[in-house]
Structures are given as structure tokens and as C-alpha cells.
Amino acid sequence: MVFRNVGRPPEEEDAEAAREPGPSELLCPRHRCALDPKALPPGLALERTWGPVAGLEAQLAALGLGQPAGPGIKTAGGGCCPCPCPPQPPPPQPPPPAAAPQAGEDPTETSDALLVLEGLESEAESLETNSCSEEELSSPGRGGGGVGGRLLLQPPGPELPPVPFPLQDLVPPGRLSRGEQQQQQPPPPPPPPGPLRPLAGPSRKGSFKIRLSRLFRTKSCNGGSGGGDGTGKRPSGDLAASAASLTDMGGSAVRELDTGRKPRLTRTQSAFSPVSFSPLFTGETVSLVDVDISQRGLTSPHPPTPPPPPRRSLSLLDDISGTLPTSVLVAPMGSSLQSFPLPPPPPPHAPDAFPRIAPIRASESLHSQPPQHLQCPLYRPDSSSFAASLRELEKCGWYWGPMNWEDAEMKLKGKPDGSFLVRDSSDPRYILSLSFRSQGITHHTRMEHYRGTFSLWCHPKFEDRCQSVVEFIKRAIMHSKNGKFLYFLRSRVPGLPPTPVQLLYPVSRFSNVKSLQHLCRFRIRQLVRIDHIPDLPLPKPLISYIRKFYYYDPQEEVYLSLKEAQLISKQKQEVEPST
């Protein structure tokens, strides 16, 4: 610590030595000033400086009521207090003469080094450095945080007695406002001894203060180095504030170690996240391509890329969000993004920015609105159901029923490009297949059926899906004629370009006039299930005729009948030689 050995002039010492001590002069100057406030220098009255309450506390602390009085209190020099108030006090001794203060010092300016030492020293050391000698009474005034700091930050406790209230901590009235503002800051260090006289000029500790301020960056914390008065100095109150940040350095270092182990958020995440991100990505998320592909406009720099086909699933919750009402989709936008929590609800007095799902009581729902069925693909009216779409398909001429790919190629042989027909798929995993002519070759592809919709692609969000096969084929014919939308088949041979799919000329099974026998069979097959045909009241040859596979085309029937006749004749020929 830095102390200044500044004493009084020799003339005042000789005048005091020449006088005989009176009864009140036997007391130490601090007790004498406490008993007689008029003995203070002009302009330093307690009531005028801190008010009547603080003045009374100062007098009680000066009389030693805050701690046990006795000779145990030591001065800075190591001796006992010369005050005659304790039992058997030693006679007062005049202080040794010291050099006068330099003209360039400012008594109201306190260096950062003293503030650091004051913040780091213990209360026991502060008890040893405080004394009731006459040198402390003549010390210069410190910052306004001295009295308030000792009254608020160092309360008397059971372990350590409170520090006697020093009267030399009084400041001129010009420093009152700043001292009152910094009452919560740590107390400044004990002042160097010297006479109480106003001095002006720059401090010789300015260079050390500047070095410390650069080291601890106290200028940026206090908002600048000017201190608000336009000069380059800071008042003692501001220095006390910087000392408070320095004394907290140890605790903040420990807190930084703890916080360093926790996951920190970046500035962008902390600005846009209202709640904690500790359970990140706990559930499945929906790809942004799948969500926004239908919302891209023509002005998008990139064309809409079709998302990959999903895994096959029979769950009813796969694509149920596409048919829910708008209020259900708009309100919990995060419901499809299950990893992010929902934002907090708005206050009750503020209008909602988006419609929310309000819980409806059972009694209110019965009287307010009729029950509405969930509009999912499996619950539709009978006109658009799967069975109705199949009944509608049977009336179309380009549907040939059960037919393999060889027979389809025979039907399309010699037809122009764009000719097509629809038949039952030979693969049990699929329902229908499409056979068409393109580039002089007959191609075959399976038609996808996903949740009651038909298309050539299995993706559920494919925009050209239809509820019935007839509707899909009609739209495909329309797109093929105007050329706005084309289908392409990926080639199984690597390196070959995809094959365009154009449906222009349907090959109808009604192109040839059928026999009455064939039409009757066709009608029976429409009305009777194939497993109920043997129960019909008909002769066995007629039942076998009705149960034949190719009941849509009589020519195929004739062809098969000829093959059967040949096989029967061969079997007969083999049986005859053996007999």
C-alpha cells in the first residue's frame, strides 16, 4: 500500500505545545469532534453532509459504542491509541513532522492501485490500519463511497467487530451527489496522512491508473474515460465502481468454468430460440423439400425437384395432414416438426396472429356444430370410393381385364405410337398395369395405388394423383395431347434415356362385335363373384364356359379353345398305343 507522510507545519505544533491541555483537550481529536460537532472544520458538518441520522451514527461510532473500547486497538505505527478515554491511557504524543504535499496532487483522486488493495484486503487488516490518531483527522477527503461503503458493505457481525467510524472520510459538498450514487460500491483504501486542505492539479498516480485501466478495461465498462466532466480524470466514485468489478474477479472466474462446461448457444440461436434447446432433434422431422415443393412459384431460381419416394407404409397417419382443415395445419406449424417446441401462447389481451385449436367441451360440440367426419382418403362418399372406381373402370373399352403382357403385346402389335390399354397386373402386389406403344416398341408399367389414389409414381405428394383410374387416364390423354405434362419411364438398361409415355389412342375391346353368348357371359361375370359361379342353377358345360379366364375377348377364347383341342387330341393319341 502507498501512504503519504504529510504532517502539519511546525508553527501549529509549537502553538499546541505551548498551550496547557484542558479537560476536553485530553480527548483524542476524533472523540472531541464527536462530542462537539462544532470542532469540525467549516463545511464538514455531519448533518449537512450525510443528514442527522448518519451524523448520530458517526458520533456513536466515534465514541466506540459499536465495538468494545480498550487499549486493544492499534494504530498504524503499532502503538496503542493515545486517547485518555480507555483506562490508563498514555499521554498524547505529537506526530513527527513530515514533508508538505506537492502542489500537483488532488486529494479527491484515488488511484486504481489503492482501490484494488482495498477490495482484496480482509477486515482484520482494515482493523489494524485504522487508528484514532491525529494524523487520520488531517487526511484528505476520499470518494463519497467511503462512509456509505463502510455502513452498508461492512455491517457488524458476530466474528469481527465493526470498524470505528472515521471522521476523515468526509468530503466537501461538491462531491455529495457522486458519493451518494456509489454507496453500494466497495470502500476505498485508507487515505495517506496529511492536512485537510483543498488542492488542485493532476495526480502523480495518473500513469499507474492509466496502466491499470488499460489492463482491466475499466474505461469501456464505465462508458468512457472522461468521467462525464469533460476532463481525463475519473472521480473516486467511478473508481470504486471499477474496484467492485475487480473484487468480483475471483467469483466470475469460477462461474466461467461452470458455464464453459454447458452447451452454449450461438448468437443466432439465442436470438431466435424462445426456450432451451437441450432436447434437440428428439423425433422425426419432415423434409423441407416435401413441405415447400408445392408452394414454389414460377419465379423460383431452381425448378421444383421431386422428392424421393417414401417407404411403403399402411399407416393411416402417413399423409393425413394433407387433408386436414386449414386451421389445423396453420396453428401448430411445429406439429410436423416435432423436434422444436411450440412458442409460448400470446397474452390473453392480445389478439392471436394465427388461428389456434381451442379445446371444445363435449356439451358445446353437440349443440354448436354437427359431427364432421375426418376427410382422409379412406373415408369418402360412395361415388369416389375404390369400389365405385373399379365399377366405372369396367365400363371403359380400353380396360381388358385379366391379361398377361404377351397377350397385351399381341393386341398392340402394329399399332401407332400412343396406343395403350389397361389390364389387370400379373403381379399380386399391384392391381393394374399399363401397356402402351412408344418409339415402335410396346412397353409395360405398373400403376401405383396409394391410399385410394392412382398414379404412375408412388410418392404421396405427387401432384398428378387421382381418386379413380378413369380420371387418371383421361387426364393423361389430355396432357399427352397438349404436351404440357408428360410421363417418363426410367430405363432398366443403364445409359439409355428415359422413355416418354404418351397416351393418345386407346385400344378398345368394343371395336369388334361380340356374340350374344359372349355378352351374356360378360354380364354374368359382372354380377356374380367367381367363387359363386359353381352354385348357379346352370348345366356344367355352361358353368365351365362362364368360368373361363379370357371372358373379355372372344378371339382369345377361340385361340385357347383350339389349343385345348390340340392338347386333348394328343392325349388321346398317347393313350391309344398304350392300350
UniProtKB/Swiss-Prot annotation:
Annotated ranges, domain SOCS box: 502-552
One Gene Ontology term, aspect cellular component: cytoplasm
Basic residues compositional bias, start-end: 206-217
Keyword Membrane attributed: yes
Classification via Pfam families: SH2, SOCS_box
All copies of domain SH2, residue ranges: 398-507
Membrane topology annotation: Peripheral membrane protein
Example of a GO biological process term: intracellular signal transduction
Annotated stretches, region: Mediates interaction with SORBS3: 124-492
GO terms, molecular function: phosphorylation-dependent protein binding; ubiquitin-like ligase-substrate adaptor activity
Expression tissues: Widely expressed with higher expression in brain and testis where it is expressed by spermatocytes and early spermatids. Also significantly expressed in spleen, skeletal muscle and kidney.
Known partners and oligomeric status: Substrate-recognition component of the ECS(SOCS7) complex, composed of SOCS7, CUL5, ELOB, ELOC and RNF7/RBX2. Interacts, via the third proline-rich region, with the second SH3 domain of the adapter protein NCK1. Also interacts with GRB2, INSR, PLCG1, SORBS3/vinexin, and phosphorylated STAT3 and STAT5. Interacts with SEPT6. Interacts with phosphorylated IRS4 and PIK3R1.
Free-text domain note: The SOCS box domain mediates the interaction with the Elongin BC complex, an adapter module in different E3 ubiquitin ligase complexes.
The protein's name: Suppressor of cytokine signaling 7
Lineage, top ranks: Eukaryota, Metazoa, Chordata, Craniata, Vertebrata
